[in-house]
Amino acid sequence: MNQTVKVTFGGNGLTGGESTAADITAFTFAEGMGGNSAVIIQPQINGTDITFMVADTTGTETLKTLIPTIAVSEKATVMPASGVAQDFSGKVTYTVIAEDGTQQVYTVSIVQTMSYYDFESWVFHSAEATDDEGNIVPSDLDYYDPAGWATSNSALVLLKGLLSACPMDAVGVGEADGRSGKGARLVSNDSKGMYMLTVVPKVTAASLFLGEFVVDMGNTLKSTHFGVPYYNQPQTVKGYYKYKAGETYYKTEVSGSGWSTVVTGVPVPEMTDSCAITAVLYEVNDYTTEWLDGVTLYDPATTNIVAIGMFTDGAEKSAFTPFEVSLNYLKAYDPAKKYKFSIICSSSKNGAEFAGAPGSELIVDDIEIINAE
C-alpha cells in the first residue's frame, strides 16, 4: 500500500552556502574600560595564539577586570562574548563559531618581561617538511629557540634550504650543556660568500638577543629587531660563558654591483675571532613600530640610545666564566618615557661586518639583569 507522508520543517535549515570562516580578526583592550589601562602592548594575533603585555606592577585583581573588544569573521560568534571581563591572570580560551558551525579555539595569554634567563625552556619551530603522502616529517631545517629570546636560526634555514650556502646539519643557535642544566650554544658558520639577491658573507655569525628576528633579504643586518619593552632601569647584565674561536679568521670583500657582484672570503691570519655580548637601552614613542637593528645600533647618527654596555673580554674560555656588562648612561633615565632593552650575544664579534671564523662557538647560561632599585 502506497502512502504519502507530509513533513513540515520548523526553523531555518542549512543551505550549504553558509560561511565557514571562524577567525578572530581583532582583539584589543580599549582605554577606559575596566582595568585596561594596565595593558601596555596591545594583543598580537599569531595563528590561534594571542599575546599581550601588561605593566610589571599589575596585580592579579586588576588582571581579572580586563575587558577585551573582539572582532570576528562575518556571521560568526565568539564565546565568551566581546566586552565581558575575563580573568587574564591565567590563559583564557575563546571559541569562534562560524555560520556553518565550524569552530576554532584561540588561547589568550600575557607576555611579561623577565630579569633572569636559565635557558631550560626551548620552543620548537617546524619547517613543515612533508613526505609523499603529505605528512609532516622531521627535517634538518627544524630548529629550537630558547624561550623569551630571538635568534638568527630562521636566516640559517634560508642559507641551508634555499641558498645551499651551509650544510644541512649546520647549527646556528641550539641547546648545549650549560653551567647549570641547559645553556645556549652559538656557532659561526662558513656560508661560502656569494651574491643571491643579497650579499651572503663568507662567515655568518650566530646571534641570540632579546627582540624579534624578521628576515630582510634586501639588507640582512636589518633582520635583527633588537629590544623588548622594558619598565625598569637596567644597570648591569651578568652571566656565564665559554668560548672557542674558529681556526681561520675571514673578512668578506664585495665588489661590483647587481648580478655582477662578487663576494670573496679573504683569510686574515693575524686575526683571532672573539665573542661579543652587548646590552642597550633606548627610547621609543611606540613599542610595536620602533626598534634598533644591526645597522642603526652601530650608527653614530642614532640618537635615541639611552645606555649601552659591551663585554670587552671575548677571548677563549674553556670553562664557564662569569661575565659582566655595565651600562653606561648617555642620557638621564626618565620612568615616564617608553624604553626598549636588549641583550645581544654573537659568536663572532665582527659578525655585523661580515667577518669572523667558521666554527667559533659561544655558550652562555644563567643571564641576569640587575636593575636600579
Q: What name fits each language-model region?
A:
Residues M1-Y117:
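Beta-rich interaction/scaffold domains
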Residues G193-D286:
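Extracellular-facing segments of soluble proteins and assemblies that are Gly/Ser/Thr-biased and enriched
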Residues D118, T236-K242, T278-V280, E324-N328, ...:
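Residues within well-ordered beta-strands of beta-sheet-rich folds
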Residues D286-P335:
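Extracellular carbohydrate recognition and processing domains
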Residues L221-V228, T321-Y333, N350-F354:
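Signal that preferentially marks extracellular ectodomain short beta-strand elements
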Residues S109-K160:
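Extracellular carbohydrate-recognition regions
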Residues K317-A319, P335-K338, S348-N371:
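Extracellular carbohydrate recognition
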Residues G174-Y195:
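Short carbohydrate-recognition loop motifs
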